[in-house]
Every structure is written in structure tokens, then in C-alpha cells.
Amino acid sequence: MDQGAPAKPSEQKVPSLRTRWEILLLTLCLLHGSSMTPPHRRSHSRWLQAGSPQFRTHLYNVEAHTAPTPLCCWKNSLSGTNALRGPRLVTGNTGGAVTIHCHYAPSSVNRHQRKYWCRLGSPLWICHTVVSTNQYTHPDYRGRAALTDIPQSGLFVVRLLRLSLGDVGLYRCGIGDRNDMLFFSVNLTVSAGPSNTTYAAAPASGEPTTASPGAASSAGNGWTSGITQILEGSGSEWDRTVPTTGTSKTTSSANGRQTLRTARTMVPGTGSREEGSIRAAVPTPEGPSPKSRSMSSTTQGVWLWSTRNSVTPSVTTSEGRRQGTTPETDGPRDETDVRVSPEAPRKTTGTTRPSALISEHVTWETLQDKTEVSKQQMLHSLEELSPAPSAQTLNATCLEVASEEGRSIDGSLENTTEESSPPTPSQLSVAGPVWVSVKGPSMKSALMEGESHTRILTPVSTVLALLLIAALILLKRSLGRQRTSQKKERVPRITLIQMTHFLPDKLPDEGKNFQQSNLLPPQASLTVLENDPRP
């Protein structure tokens, strides 16, 4: 009998409630795990196409923080065992070929996974597959792109043939069914030969004389001054330049602003290091914010890194990437030109440094005058001297922090000298954002006012709580009294009716006569009238 009886509703609700609680706890656990896991930092590069018909391409590095997915345990373990590594920058010549080696952990899972080589394309920055192990090759790369997988060695090799300037871009070398699961970025640059033309002029009796590229004048360890002009041609700015030694100084005027450009190179054969610096005599601007862009050039196996700062009217930030327009405006322009001879391959660093007109002191006075940070330019300079046998190396670092319309540009600072001096206060200010702390009686008064408000609110809340409790107690007592009084009023009333039966023998004579006269005849019928209970 009990087995056939249906289950109670309460027993049916128990499994559903347990299931809901389990799902809720699992969700909270996953969310907690993903929030506690530190974000992974992945550095990649993007290409910014300038609006010129000569395809000038500028490469800038961006650091992106990618947070892990909620399935952190499985995803992190998978990425830890399947870490990819390989070259970050690959350079080739027009018509030549490049080979990229992508290494991965030789596990049983990775051996059977899909390997791919894809290219990021604008405007959505979707990575389009070029070639993969699924026997797929993009139509534009057929016959000149190949991918070979070597599972035993944990390596797959990508080879691109017949390179052209159109192949310059950002690529991905990865593993997985999708092109955004596990990968690392590779920058491919194609060199079309020397595209920078240099004109050098040496002074003779106070008048400049034009000299051909490559002409070097040396007088012991002396310096040679002249006028240097760099013309940008087609192709990317990862180009080769003709080695030239000398020093050039140029003073030009752009809307009343003077710019002094200096490029220095030691004479080869002295065993000394090269130095490159720029001293700009520019008043503190209040107009458009500056934007730094970097380029690199090479001279017959020696890579040179130079920094160029120019004024941009606006800087915009979009989803997933940072873009800016850098037109050649009338504003100040600083440029570093560092050249080295192929006979002395060594590290060469060229950076920019402001002059004494834009110094730390002026910047802090501007901040104390409560000038808006979005309309000023903070320049912090640092000079480091490293000893050398015959000459000294000057490494000037400069960080420009500016913003317009609430957006800011963060500059990264890298020191490539072999020896560095201890950090100075200006270097500490360059290393991170500037925080201005305000101390004084205003801060103390604000703190005292906040404490007094807290002290006042605490007793008021306590008194209100006590009053509420007392009111509830009184209300409960009054309700109890009303209920007891109503119960007392509802006491039942009993009415006793006593009926006495008189026998006919014991009736008096008058009563007998009255009874006989009132008796009905035996044939008569007694009719009882009933009252209608309805109104």
C-alpha cells in the first residue's frame, strides 16, 4: 500500500533545491577562482598605417592584459603544458624567403592538434589563416607558403617564399581549432633596400659645403659639424642607411619656435662608444599633445634605434588597439640621427633630451599653479655618464606625458647602455606616473569633520533602534490585553426554565370547569400556524 502511494510535494522539492544550490555553489567557485588568478601579460605589436601614398608603416608595441576565462583550472593547466615559443621579429628581403620555427611541448595532445599560421587584418583585427596542417592554404599564398609539423621534436616550421612589401604585418603562430586559443605573435618586416638618403655638409670658412653620402671627415678624435637631412622613401622604416660619421646642427624656425637638432657619431677606429642626443629649445606648449613613435634602421649588420617625437593634433583610443594621426604640422619636431661605421659594430642608442628651458623645476611650478594636467607637457630629463677609455657615452632619456580630451599616452623607457648610474629623483619620476599629494590644515579639517559626522550618526542610530524595540513591545502588550478582554466578555449565559406538571385530579374546581369548557371536540382538528422565518 505504501509503495504505490504518490510522493509528497515536499519530497519532490528537495532534489530540485539541492540541484539549484549545487549550481549556485559551482558558479561562485568558478567566479572566485577566475578573480583570484592574476591576469596574464602578453606583449604584441600592431601596425599603424599613415595616410601617405608611399606606404610608410610605423610599428609600436602594446602590452595587453588578458584575464583568464572562468574555466581557470583547465585553461591554465592547458596553457602551462602547451606553452609556445618562437621568434617575435622576423626580417626578410624583397623576393627572398623567411623560415619561422614554432616550438611547443611534445605531449600526446599537442601532437594531434591543428597547427596554423595566420595573419591579423584590419579593421576588425581578425586573424585569417594563411596555412595550416589541415591541408589549407590561403589563395594569396598558394605556392609560396608551407607548414611542416615535426611532432617528435615538438616543432612546426613555417616557410614563406617570394616576399614582397605586401607581406609586412603581424602574424600568429599557434595551436588549436581556433585562431585565438594558443598562439604567439610574430612581426614580419620586408626590406626593399636602402630607402633613406643622407646629405652631409661640412663648413668651410663659415659657409656650408654639400658632401656626398658616406663621406667621413676625421681629425684625430675631433668632431665635424654639418647639415644632415633625411628623406623618407617608400616601404617600411626598418631600412638600411649609409654609414656616415660627423656631427650636424640645424636651427630652424616653425611659427616662432626654435628647434635645435644635434646628431653625433664618434670617428671609427677609436674604440669608443657612440652617442646621440637632441637638445630642443621649445617653450612650454599649451596646444596639442605630443606623441612618440619609434623606428629602427640598420647599417650593414648593425642595428640602430632612434626615437622621433612630433606634435599630433589629437590622439584617439579605440577597442583593442591604439591609433593616432601624425601629420607633419607646424609644431616642433625632434629627430635623432645616429650613424655608425660597419668596421666597429657596437650598440648605438639615440634618444631625445629636452633643454634647460623645459625642466623639472618649471614643470613642478606649473603643477603648483593648479594648471590642468591635460593642457601641459611634463618633461623629466636624466643624464647618465658611463666611463670609457677615450670618450664618454651620453645617454639622455626623455618621457613626455601629455593628454588631450581625457586620454593619455604612456611612454615606455628602455636603457640599453652597459652600465647605469643609481636612480635619481628625476629618474624615479620618469619610472611611473606623477602623484601630487596635498597636506595641510584643509586635509586635517576634512578628517576631523568626517570623524565628527561618524560620532554623531552612531548614537542617533542606537537611539532609533531602542525606540523601535520599545514601540514593538508596547504594541504586543496592548494586543494581548485586547484579546483577554474579548475572551472575558464572551462568557456563556445559561437560562433555567422550570416546568411544573399538574395532574387533573389535583386541580381545583375552577380549574376543572375551565379545562372542560376549553376542550375541543374529538372530531375537531388542531391547526398549528407556523411563523415564516423569512423577513
Curated annotation (Swiss-Prot):
Annotated keywords: Adaptive immunity, Cell membrane, Disulfide bond, Glycoprotein, Immunity, Immunoglobulin domain, Membrane, Receptor, Signal, Transmembrane, Transmembrane helix
Region (Mediates immunoglobulin Fc fragment-binding): 95-117
Positions with biased composition (Polar residues): 291-328, 413-429, 513-528
Low complexity: bias regions: 208-220, 241-253
Biased composition (Basic and acidic residues): 330-346
Highest taxon, organism lineage: Eukaryota
Protein name (database record): High affinity immunoglobulin alpha and immunoglobulin mu Fc receptor
Organism of provenance: Mus musculus
Native organism taxonomy: Eukaryota, Metazoa, Chordata, Craniata, Vertebrata
